[in-house]
Curated annotation (Swiss-Prot):
Cofactor: [4Fe-4S] cluster
Residue sites binding [4Fe-4S] cluster per the record: C97, C132
Additional facts recorded: This subunit is associated with the iron-iron nitrogenase component 2 (the third type of nitrogenase).
InterPro entries per UniProt: NifH/chlL_CS, NifH/frxC, Nitrogenase_Fe_NifH, P-loop_NTPase
Catalytically driven reaction(s): N2 + 8 reduced [2Fe-2S]-[ferredoxin] + 16 ATP + 16 H2O = H2 + 8 oxidized [2Fe-2S]-[ferredoxin] + 2 NH4(+) + 16 ADP + 16 phosphate + 6 H(+)
Species this protein is from: Rhodobacter capsulatus
CDD domains referenced in this protein's UniProt entry, alphabetically: NifH (cd02040)
Underlying gene: anfH
Biological process (GO), any one: nitrogen fixation
Keywords from the UniProt entry: 4Fe-4S, ADP-ribosylation, ATP-binding, Iron, Iron-sulfur, Metal-binding, Nitrogen fixation, Nucleotide-binding, Oxidoreductase
Protein name per Swiss-Prot or TrEMBL: Nitrogenase iron protein 2
Length: 275
């Protein structure tokens, strides 16, 4: 049975990097069949898996050829360890709604049976901290069953995580989606781990893994690879291996209890993140 997971988090927090490195570790170390569906108009959710190759998006194919000619072969590409990849794409800049593109792309993938039954994991890598409209579709309509939020010990990352939890709590009862935990993509700020542990406990979940900051991630990206492909014996590859293991074994799924703004600000002040 395929586990369907949406990855959310503040813009620039490293969602796509975390998603791709986790997917690579699941495929390489744990021998899982993985599919990544990029839900960002930038269409950069799968480039490390595909060795930096540009991918024609679902929306581009729709514009060029029409819905009736969109096929799995045209828009789904296979990369490292047979990880399958598709990018929703979006409208031309300044025209239309990118969220609508996410809805259209997911619907088309389902109609074309792209999410095959042999998959162990299907990841939706979702734009920024937007939890309304089309970008909420994976959690609103039950396309994803689990959510992991990528955060750090920085103030705005925590604010974004709390806002995502508000959206998740709103849709959870109607769609059945649940929060599986917070992934800390470390920025090496003071008290980061302690802050994340207190925040996750307060909202009723856990920090599923603390991913330390390591320059090998950037080195691998320069080589258009995930860390696991670039240097599988590296410490950072083992961190993603461990994150993958924790996701595989995770059975702790909750409806989060987001903090009120005064509670959140008090926590931020406690850890010295606000002047």
């Amino acid at each position: 049975m395929t586990r369907k997971i949406a990855i959310y988090g503040k813009g620039g927090i490293g969602k796509s990097t975390t998603t791709q490195n986790t997917a690579a570790a699941l495929a390489f170390f744990h021998e899982k069949n993985v599919f990544i569906h990029g839900c960002d108009p930038k269409a950069d959710s799968t480039r490390l898996i595909l060795g930096g190759l540009p991918q024609q998006t679902v929306m581009d194919t729709l514009r060029i050829e029409g819905a009736e000619r969109v096929t799995v072969d045209k828009v789904v590409k296979t990369g490292f360890k047979d990880i399958r990849c598709v990018e929703s794409g979006g409208p031309e800049p300044g025209v239309g709604c990118a969220g609508r593109g996410v809805i259209t792309a997911i619907d088309l993938m389902e109609e074309n049976e792209a999410y095959s039954e042999d998959l162990d994991f299907l990841f939706f890598d979702v734009l920024g901290d937007v939890v309304c409209g089309g970008f909420a579709m994976p959690i609103r309509d039950g396309k994803a069953e689990e959510v992991y939020i990528v955060a750090s010990g920085e103030m705005m990352a925590i604010y974004a995580a709390n806002n995502i939890c508000k959206g998740l709590a709103k849709y959870a009862r109607q769609s059945g989606v649940r929060l599986g935990g917070i992934i800390c993509n470390s920025r090496n700020v003071d008290g980061e781990k302690e802050f994340l542990e207190e925040f996750t406990k307060a909202i009723g979940t856990k920090m599923i893994h603390f991913v330390p900051r390591d320059n090998i991630v950037q080195k691998a990206e320069f080589n258009k690879q995930t860390v696991t492909e670039f240097q599988p014996e590296a410490n950072q590859a083992q961190e993603y291996r461990e994150l993958g293991r924790k996701i595989i074994e995770n059975e702790d799924f909750v409806i989060p209890k987001p903090l009120a703004m005064d509670e959140l600000e008090a926590m931020v002040v406690k850890y010295g993140l606000m002047d």
